[in-house]
Amino acid sequence: MFNDQVGLDSQWFIHNDIRPCSLFEVNVNPCKKRKTYCDAEYWLKSIRTGQGYIEPVMLSYDIECLLRPGEFPDPKRDPVITIGCYTKTESKCFCLQETPGYDSFPTETAMLKAFLRYVQRVSPDILTGYNINRFDNTYIETRCKKLGIDFKWSRMRGHVSSIQHITTHSNQKGTQ
């Protein structure tokens, strides 16, 4: 592996001997104007890796869409009807229309807004799921745009998120 194949953020971690999900010893100054939804914000003066490990918060989700028989779902036309979510401490299901025992919403817009608020509340370090990078993330982003919903699941206040599309290649899976 060559230096130009390692992202700048990863290079910073390597050069500063920072191990993600470790405990850290830091010197900070409090921020006067908050820019995130985090509990506290600080300007970092210095950092050193300490001992121990912090388990990352993971949120796994999957969507189901209403589709036409024999066709693949199209986010420009077919609504999301269910979003199932799972964390280590809870599971949640957002459903379009009345579904006993689950969080039900009269419109897709209301359901997607509730899901985005949930993602912000959970504030996951890792957002995962089956095929989310090749389907679910883009589908939700497209539906939000179509319905006029700000796609906000960032920790940054006022930041409208966007899905970054990347192409990968391996001998096993080919180009994706």
Language-model-detected regions and their locations in the chain:
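The two-metal-ion catalytic cores of nucleic-acid processing enzymes
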Residues: M1-Q176
